[in-house]
Amino acid sequence: MSTTTTEARSPLPLLLRRGRSSTALSASTAEARSPLSILQFRRRSSKDVRNITSVSSSLLPAFGTFIEDDNPSSKPFIVLHFDRRYRLWELFLVILVGYSAWASLFELAFEKAAEGALLTIDLVVDFFFAVDIILTFFVSYLDNTTYLNVTDHKLIAKRYLKSVAFVMDVASTLPIQFIYKTITGDVGRGQAFGFLNLLRLWRLRRVAELFKRLEKDAHFNYFVIRVIKLLCVTIFWIHLAGCILYWIAYHYPRPTDTWIGSQVEDFKERSVWLGYTYSMYWSIVTLTTVGYGDLHAVNSREKTFNMFYMLFNIGLTSYIIGIMTNLVVHGALRTFAMRSAINDILRYTSKNRLPDTMREQMLAHMQLKFKTAELRQEEVLQDLPKAIRSSINQHLFRSIIEEAYLFKGFPEGLLVQLVSQIQAEYFPPKMEIILQNEIPTDFYVIVSGGVDIIASKGVSEQVLAKLGPGSMAGEIGVVFNIPQPFTVRTRRLSQVIRIGHHKFKEMVQSDNDVDAKMIIANFMTYLKGLNDELKKEIPFLRDLLDDADAQVQETVQSEETPQSNDEEIVTVSRHENGQIEERRREGVPKRVIIHGQAPPNQDNKNNGDSNGRLIILPDSIQLLFDLAEKKLGKRGSTIAMADGAHVEQIDALRENDHLYIF
């Protein structure tokens, strides 16, 4: 084996030479890379996770602030605005807001309805909102400038009293009609009471805040929330317009010259629900621009209102159509993108006259890319913190990495680093993952599916092996730093883990030498177990395995331990029982070139091997003679340098010396 070939194909560069002892380095590395410091986290229940997702949209603490997990507020009689129970109270009030919005307009248009049961219901509803006013003085709030949760009683009360919300809350909660009846003994039937009741529409802001929060809550479907919001807006607008239309007709001086009086002459004496039905019917017909003609504006007041009503309907209809179009189109964007990508592939293959096999592979890969879009971790995890991404990778791929032969016996810290940097990919059937003779940039661990190891024989191909989940592909080219010796092709839909060459090399070289030795030991054991067909495809593999066995043999037989400097060399061997043996010797491993002939400057030149053999210098002269006999095919008795000087001590030799053994 030539010098260049041995240097390029030797896996020994992965063995790190340290200036300090392996024991000290291992201890320091273990301390620095303790898995407990990396993976230690507090487990959260599903309830905790739900609380986090609900709080995150409304509570944004400033940097450097700390909020306790159990009770962020240590002050008594304080209700946290993001507390789950307070959220339920707000939801209950939203239901009452819906009634208030309907009743205030209904009582304005139909005065007779405000005297009956609705008056009692209004009092009950106002009572709950009065309780909420008192409760607001004890509810924390989020400071918009510091983003801190304020729990001070004085600050909460001062902020609420100085706000417009306090004045409007009190005004919309006062039961003015009931107070008037209590004082005067007469039921207030004037229009003033109806308009004062419209102050209750101020409560609609609670509905807007609820939808704003639900749209950002991951527990609810965004499409459904937006549709419900549009439906509520439409129903409220129909109810508002219908009540105003009836109020205009009811208070017009000539009842028969109104839109409803022309159809029902005595509509004022008829049932309230009859008038409400007519009002809703005409409001819906006008909103939808159907216009049957059975109901129409008669007097100038109704015509004026209808003009503004239809103008507003144009904007409302445009808003609803725009929102619905956006929601529907958003769901079809992925399909449109896939169709566009497929059309681009078809045009490209047709223009460049690519064969059908390549076209089918490109189409299959593109379709698989869109089908597995939700499973590809890069797009899902790219915006997450590194710690969360690492935890997800540990959960998904830790077990499969531990089963791979190359990483068996790996320390915890190195496994954490490796799993944190891997990437998962999907490949459709009959897709080449690795091409023969390509540059070894990555190697793969098969998670699911299966692949074939293929060697090209001219125009034909030969399947050398079939690999399943847990197997590795492409690692031979990466470790030896040679062009990939085989083609790797999927048999069916396969998920693989891709590990980059440079990242793997940097990670191993930055760790202690014990980890590198473990990789080499596992790798050499795997190479010895390859079938003969695979070994034939790697010409230098047999010589490399023989050299490794010879080095182990020399290390076992060596009794000398020369000291040269502070560096330490560790030799690893794996016994048949699976145990790994480590032997240490001081000094940098020296590589020398041996020749089976006398030095060329002497008269008695032999016709031996002029190219020489590159070997690692053993520990003694006797072992050097034994190794030379095995490599050169003949045993010598003398060792000389190129200048003819005889070698008597092994320590006198230097790196890349030419030794002539004869």
From Swiss-Prot:
Annotated InterPro entries: cNMP-bd_dom (IPR000595), cNMP-bd_dom_sf (IPR018490), Ion_trans_dom (IPR005821), K_chnl_volt-dep_EAG/ELK/ERG (IPR003938), KAT/AKT (IPR045319), KHA_dom (IPR021789), RmlC-like_jellyroll (IPR014710)
Gene Ontology, cellular component aspect: endoplasmic reticulum; monoatomic ion channel complex; plasma membrane
GO molecular function annotations of the record: voltage-gated potassium channel activity
Intramembrane region residues: 278-297
Organism: Arabidopsis thaliana (Mouse-ear cress)
Chain ranges on the Extracellular side, renumbered to this chain: 112-118, 185-194, 251-277, 298-301
Sequence positions that bind a nucleoside 3',5'-cyclic phosphate: 406-527
Protein name: Potassium channel KAT3
Domain remarks: The segment S4 is probably the voltage-sensor and is characterized by a series of positively charged amino acids. The pore-forming region H5 is enclosed by the transmembrane segments S5 and S6 in the Shaker-type (1P/6TM) and contains the GYGD signature motif which seems to be involved in potassium selectivity. The KHA domain (rich in hydrophobic and acidic residues) present in the C-terminal part is likely to be important for tetramerization.
KHA domain mapped to chain residues: 591-662
PANTHER family: POTASSIUM CHANNEL AKT1 (PTHR45743), POTASSIUM CHANNEL KAT3 (PTHR45743:SF27)
A Pfam family annotated for this UniProt entry: KHA
Role summary: Probable modulatory (alpha) subunit of inward-rectifying potassium channels. Could mediate potassium uptake from the soil solution by plant roots in association with AKT1.
